[in-house]
Amino acid sequence: MHELPYGLYIIGSKEADGEKVNGMMADWVMQVSFNPRLVGVAFEKDAHTLGNVRKHGVFSVNLLAADKDSMELARPFAQPHSGTKVRGRKGAEATAVHYKLDGLDHRLTERGCPVLDAALAWFECEAEQYVEIGDHTLVVGRVLDGRVEREAEPMTSTYTGWTYSG
């Protein structure tokens, strides 16, 4: 499973209190329908962002470029929100990062979801289904809006060397 290549995406959400926005890295993201336009995103069942999506019903998907600047931008998003998820990590990688969008250039969609200024492309989704599958929850979202901002190769697990698998 470690050898399966995936795209790497930043999933944006409004915090439960509605005051702040946050983001997490996801690699289990896929289109599941042309008509209507639906995507699926798999979240760990205890993911902070999943709680935000359940509360507000919307999320954004940001695609990043396969380049050095985007790698640095993405690095904090690979950190967990909770310190309980840092087992086996050392040094800076063992630190929980709460508000990963703080200090990063971004804007909010009409529905309040964050879009990174550095994104190659983005889309905003309304959650339609939550499917419990093993140790993850698959959120099926209807694409409401989105745009390709620029052309470049998208970031993948093959490019970064990062893996998330069991």
Question: Where would I find each of the regions flagged by the language model?
Answer:
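Basic, polyanion-binding surface patches
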Residues: 1-166
